[in-house]
Amino acid sequence: MISIEEFSGGKKGLAEGACGLLGVAGRFKLSSIIHSAECLQYRARTGAGITIKGLYKELNFHVLHIMYRNQHKVLELEKALNEWGIRILEAHDLVARKYYYEYDLPIIKSYYITPPSEDEMMYRAKMSDADSYIRNQVAKFNSLYMDDARIFSSSKENGTFLTAFQLDDTVKIYDILQYEDNFYDACLIHLRWPTTRGRGLWWGPQPISLGELAGIHNGHLSSDRANAKALEQLGIQIHVGTDSECIFLMADYLVENNYSLEEIEWIVCRKFPQEVDEMDINKKEEYYKIINNPILDKMKMSGPATSIVLKDDIIMGFTDRDHLRSFSIGRNDDVAIMASEQRAILSASYYLNENLNELYDPEAGKIIAFKLDNGKIDKLDYSWRKNGIK
C-alpha cells in the first residue's frame, strides 16, 4: 500500500501544460468523441487515455487490461492472480506486435476472467459480491506490484485504454476505431500527465479506472494527503498514487453510502461562512453534523481541481470551491457533455450532430450529475441518493 508520505509527489519533473478533459454521456459512435477531443491536445503534450462505457457489456465477464514492465513478469503475475482465486478464461495481446517496434511500450494484455465461487470468496475475503472481490484484488495487485505491472481496466462493462503518448497515438496503438460499429453510452477522454509525480509503471495516464468506476481530473489538490488519510481510515486502498485517485474514490464511497448530491457537495466543497449564515436552521444543523464527522472532514478538496467521474450509470462533474480551473457543460435530452473548455463541447455537438439546449459554466464548488437511462439523459437534482431514501 502507498504510504501517505509517498503519496503527494508535487510537480517535480513535469512539463508545463494543463489537462484536457472530455466526458460525454448519451448514445454515440466513438469517432465523433475522439475527433471532439482533438482540439484539447495543445494543452496536454503527452499522456492520453480513453474509457468507453458499454464496450464489454455483452460478454458477462470481468475484463482486465494489464501492462507489464517486461515479458518476464507476465507468467509470474498471471500466477499471482490465479493464487487469489481469479480464473483466467482467455488472454489476448491488446496491442499489435508492430507497435512495440514503433513505440516504447510495456507489454499490454487483456484477460477475460471469472471470480471465485461465493463460498471461496467468503473463505478468502469474507465477502460474497464478485464485483467487490475483483476490485479489492485489483487494488491489492496494483499496490503489491506497482513497479512491475498495473491493472488499468477491470470492468464487466467498460474498457480503459492508456498510453504515455498523444491521443492519436493511443487511438492507433489500441486500434480504438475497431470498435466504431457499435453505439456507446458514455466516454471519458483525458489528455496529459497528472500533476503529482506518482510511482510505478506508466503511472501517469488517466482515466483511472477500478471496476465500474472511472474518472478524469484537471488541476492539483493541495488537500491530497488529508484526502488519502480519510480513505486509508476507511480501509480503501490507494493503488495508483496520484492526487486524482482520491477524488474518484471519495466520490465512489459517498455515492455508495447514500449521501445526496447536496451532501457530497458540502463534504468536498465547503461553503463560505456567509453561505452557511443564509441556510435555514435545519439545513444548517445537517451541514455541521456532516462536515464535523472526523473522516468526512478530511474529504474536503482544496486547490485547483475540476473532474468528471463515471460511476455505474451516473456521470458527475466537480468544480473546485474557488473556480481555479475552467469547466463547462452542454446538454439536451439525448446527450450531456462535460469538458475543460467550451470549444470541446461545441466540437462534440458538431460531430454528434446535436443541438444543445444549454451550454454553461457551473458555479464554483458545484456538482452537476446526470443519469444514463436507455439512451436518454436525466439531470439529477441535489436530493438524489443512490438508494432513493435517506
Tell where the protein language model's regions lie, with residue ranges.
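Conserved short alpha-helical segments that host acidic/polar catalytic motifs at enzyme active sites
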Residues: 1-390
